[in-house]
């Protein structure tokens, strides 16, 4: 009899559903529970059979709901979305553990699998270890308007996950099982009685605190675990590597508190507070770990020996308790704790919760703390206690090297237009008669190069500048102060949004010079200047821009002297998609990478790409492993950064084990893409030509709908929740860059989020069907065979179709048609929705023909089962949301209806898992 591997998942979903149902019944009565069940069953009939009678019945039920009933229904299905996600995550952990326990071959996407592949290719373990000496792998957390999880909710969900995990790993006695059941009921009740939404709009500081919760839950402990596992695997394959300690190649960065592009609430004061909050979190973690370590290392002289360095460290400790005279390790740790507590006070101005034994000198730099911990490590290893050095001390030493006193590197980001205005104002006051804004590109570059070579600053303390200019200068001065206070890694990068020419980079360089972060006479540049190319046109021009930049001798000298001849370039997936559609965006990004690889190689500069990916496929999302391996050869080279945005952060890193698995996937993919890429054949020329032809048609189809169809803007605003998203207290940043309803001014995030909420997912697929249909008409003989060969042989094209497959499977035209019904102009509604419907069918037909699948997701049975399990509980939320939108737009002033809409947005985002 074949084992049903998904039976435990279904059991967990039933368990959580039953507990939630019991909670609803207890809190609101049998009638409320029966109503929710009736809606669920009717929705299932509607989804399963496209049953029009079920649709009419459902509309009748929803139309008759009172306001209070509506809130109960929305909350019930929203929380079930959250609970089913917990069950699914637990099942992934369960299956991974079963795989390891069975001793099966390493799974694709694991570090073990990557090492096996690399070793099989002939690379020795020592070469693999050396790879990490120059590697940099960094997921970067960003705060965006799709991040809808409250920390209170996350805490409840973490408790539920722990309870499920305990039931999984242990054989419980009847009494223990009863205690577990009661704890589960208590936690679900707490969840039900916890407000899902914030009463006020998030501040940036709130977003910082939310981001810090993932460090506490996952990163601070799981990164050291991952490093240790990787080191152990390398040593097991080559004993000569014993004692291997890899450099801090894997770091988790952050934009939260440093991203000023379109967010006026990110100020110098906020940046300073962010730095302090991060430092407080990491110092508190170190102090707690040291306290626990001191309790464990009770080794006594006479039973063990200790190194002279350790004895000297103990002698310098302010801990003179007679009870610890013969316990040098404890005394040494007490001394380290005292110095770290003093560092806490010096950096933050506050005492830690647990006071040291006495006052001590603070650490001047994190390297001093690392050196003291190394003394303990070496003494343990040299004196018969190596096993003790491999436990908590090893993890703490690793954490100190990764997180420093700053916790997470913060990127600064600002729009190039802001830099331009600030530079123009500074030049106008420092060089009378200079009108920078009127200069052409060549004149701008000449002037900026001249100013960069001039020692004097442009800014004068005697001039009153505009608020914008004062604010920007204050940010860079705060960054310089942060370098002195927390170390250079605290703020390593400055990113320029909307980069379109060389002057954009030089403008930032000039502003860095004003703050002392760039010192040309020393050939010193303290941060990376990172251009962000976002639109289709800017992506096409990116190689040319960097080529002309590298032709400037002064700039190249800075790279050679201060940046190790490495330059980072960020590529924007979100805006390029909104600009040109899914297919054209993906192709434009691929071509930009090929062009950049050639330019950087010609100039002898190492390329580091920063991928600005969102959670949804429409914003470059999708599985990280496939995405990294789909990069063109030479694009990774051991260095990669990528954004982790919106609700994806909670989904990927809310659970520690899931978080470690996701970090491992990024490391494994980077290892394979860097070391094995030259073994993959380059795509055939005819593949590239075909892709260009497909892109041209897809671009025309997408632009024709979104930007050239009269009334489309109105259709979008009336058929989606975009207006309501703008009201929701989610992120600190406005949904649009400018006031108004123009799609050009709308941020890519709420654009994609809105299409996800109405279940059309349009940015993730529209245009592909038209492109394939048109191209096949012109290549009737061998067209489909060529497309199938592209899918089979070219990882880029395969990943593109795999992501589209996922999005198409999550699309629901029947539900989307109900949202279309919100459009008041019937002719406009029918014309546009019919066009979208036809394109969806053409796209599905094209995808199935190319991949050879009979149904969507045949090649991804795991996701197919997940959708089958979860979506019957997600669909009712959409149906209720449509009814709520209808009522809201008729009344506008009903707070309970607004609340229901906002809760439904949260629940649908949770159910889709990658909607923003």
Swiss-Prot record:
This is Phosphoenolpyruvate carboxylase. PANTHER family: PHOSPHOENOLPYRUVATE CARBOXYLASE (PTHR30523:SF6). The keyword Lyase applies. Its EC number is 4.1.1.31. SUPFAM superfamilies: Phosphoenolpyruvate/pyruvate domain. It is an enzyme of class 4 (lyase). GO terms for biological process: carbon fixation; oxaloacetate metabolic process; tricarboxylic acid cycle. Belongs to the PEPCase type 1 family. Its cofactor is Mg(2+). It catalyses: oxaloacetate + phosphate = phosphoenolpyruvate + hydrogencarbonate. The lineage of its organism: Bacteria, Pseudomonadati, Pseudomonadota, Betaproteobacteria, Rhodocyclales. Disulfide bonds: none annotated. Signal peptide: none annotated. It comes from the Bacteria.
């Amino acid at each position: 009899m074949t084992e049903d591997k998904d039976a435990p998942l279904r059991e967990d979903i039933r368990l959580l559903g039953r507990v939630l149902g019991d909670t609803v019944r207890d809190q609101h009565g049998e009638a409320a529970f029966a109503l929710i069940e009736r809606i669920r069953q009717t929705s299932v009939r509607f989804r399963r059979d496209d049953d029009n009678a079920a649709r009419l019945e459902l509309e009748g039920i929803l139309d008759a709901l009172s306001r209070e009933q509506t809130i109960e229904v929305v909350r019930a299905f929203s929380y079930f979305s959250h609970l089913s996600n917990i069950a699914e995550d637990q099942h992934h952990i369960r299956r991974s553990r079963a795989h390891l326990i069975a001793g099966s071959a390493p799974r694709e996407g694991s570090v073990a699998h990557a090492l096996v592949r690399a070793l099989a290719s002939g690379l020795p373990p020592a070469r693999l270890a050396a790879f990490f000496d120059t590697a940099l792998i960094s997921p970067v957390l960003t705060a965006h308007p799709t991040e809808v999880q409250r920390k209170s909710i996350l805490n409840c969900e973490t408790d539920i996950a722990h309870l499920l995990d305990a039931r999984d790993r242990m054989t419980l006695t009847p009494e223990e099982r009863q205690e577990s059941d009661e704890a589960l009921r208590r936690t679900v009740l707490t969840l039900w009685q916890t407000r899902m939404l914030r009463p006020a709009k998030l501040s940036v500081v709130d977003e910082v605190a939310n981001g810090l919760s993932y460090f506490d839950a996952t990163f601070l402990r799981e990164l050291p675990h991952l490093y240790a596992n990787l080191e152990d695997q390398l040593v097991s394959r080559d004993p000569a590597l014993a004692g291997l300690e890899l450099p801090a190649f894997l770091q988790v960065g952050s934009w939260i508190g440093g991203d000023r592009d379109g967010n006026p609430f990110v100020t110098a004061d906020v940046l300073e507070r962010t730095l302090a909050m991060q430092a407080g979190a990491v110092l508190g973690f170190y102090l707690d770990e040291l306290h626990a370590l001191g309790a464990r290392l009770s080794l006594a002289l006479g039973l063990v020996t200790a190194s002279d360095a350790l004895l000297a460290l103990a002698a310098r400790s302010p801990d003179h308790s007679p009870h610890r005279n013969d316990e040098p390790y404890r005394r040494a740790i007490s001394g380290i704790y005292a110095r770290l507590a003093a560092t806490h006070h010096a950096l933050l101005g506050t005492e830690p919760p647990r006071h040291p034994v006495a006052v001590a000198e603070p650490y001047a730099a994190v390297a001093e703390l690392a050196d003291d911990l190394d003394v303990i490590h070496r003494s343990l290893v040299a004196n018969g206690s190596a096993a003790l050095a491999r436990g908590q001390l090893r993890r703490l030493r690793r954490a100190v090297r990764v997180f420093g006193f700053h916790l997470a590197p913060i990127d600064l980001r600002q729009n190039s237009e802001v830099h331009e205005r600030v530079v123009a104002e500074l030049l106008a006051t420092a060089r009378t008669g200079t009108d920078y804004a009127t200069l052409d590109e060549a004149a701008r570059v000449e002037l900026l190069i001249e100013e960069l070579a001039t020692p004097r600053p442009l800014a004068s303390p005697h001039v009153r500048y505009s608020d914008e200019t004062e604010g920007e200068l204050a940010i860079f001065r705060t960054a310089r102060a942060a370098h002195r206070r927390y170390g250079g890694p605290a703020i390593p990068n400055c990113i320029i949004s909307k980069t379109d020419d060389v002057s954009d980079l030089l403008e930032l360089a000039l502003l860095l010079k004003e703050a002392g972060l760039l010192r040309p006479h020393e050939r010193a540049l303290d941060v990376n200047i990172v251009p962000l190319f976002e639109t289709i046109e800017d992506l096409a021009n990116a190689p040319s821009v960097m080529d002309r930049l590298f032709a400037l001798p002064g700039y190249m000298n800075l790279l050679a002297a201060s940046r190790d001849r490495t330059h980072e370039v960020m590529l924007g997936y979100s805006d390029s998609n909104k600009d040109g559609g899914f297919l054209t965006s993906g192709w434009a990004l691929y071509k930009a990478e090929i062009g950049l690889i050639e330019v950087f190689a010609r100039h002898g500069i190492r390329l580091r790409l920063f991928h600005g990916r969102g959670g949804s496929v429409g914003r470059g999302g999708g599985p990280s492993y496939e995405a990294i391996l789909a990069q063109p050869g030479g694009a990774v080279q051991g260095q990669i950064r990528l954004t982790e945005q919106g609700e994806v952060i909670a989904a990927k890193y809310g659970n520690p084990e899931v978080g470690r698995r996701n970090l491992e996937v990024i490391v494994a993919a980077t290892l394979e893409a860097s070391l094995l890429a030259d073994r993959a054949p380059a795509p055939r020329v005819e593949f590239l030509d075909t892709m260009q032809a497909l892109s041209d048609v897809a671009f025309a189809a997408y632009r024709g709908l979104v930007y050239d169809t009269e009334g489309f803007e109105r259709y979008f605003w009336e058929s989606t929740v975009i207006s309501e998203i703008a009201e929701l207290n989610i992120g600190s940043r406005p949904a649009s860059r400018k006031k108004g309803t123009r799609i050009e001014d709308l941020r890519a995030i709420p654009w994609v989020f809105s299409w996800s909420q109405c279940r059309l997912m349009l940015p993730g697929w529209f245009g592909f069907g038209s492109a394939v249909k048109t191209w096949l008409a012109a290549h009737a003989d061998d067209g489909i065979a060529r497309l199938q060969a592209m899918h089979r042989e070219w990882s880029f094209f395969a990943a593109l179709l795999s992501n589209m497959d996922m999005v198409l499977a999550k699309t629901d035209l029947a539900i989307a048609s109900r949202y279309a019904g919100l459009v008041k102009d019937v002719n406009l509604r029918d014309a546009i929705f019919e066009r979208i419907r036809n394109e969806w069918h053409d796209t599905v037909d094209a995808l199935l023909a190319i991949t050879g699948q009979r149904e969507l997701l045949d090649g991804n049975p795991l996701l197919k089962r997940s959708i089958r399990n979860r979506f019957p509980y997600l669909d009712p939320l959409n149906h209720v949301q449509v009814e709520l939108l209808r009522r809201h737009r008729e009344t506008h002033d009903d707070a309970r209806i607004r609340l229901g809409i906002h809760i439904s947005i949260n629940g649908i985002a949770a159910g889709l898992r990658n909607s923003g």
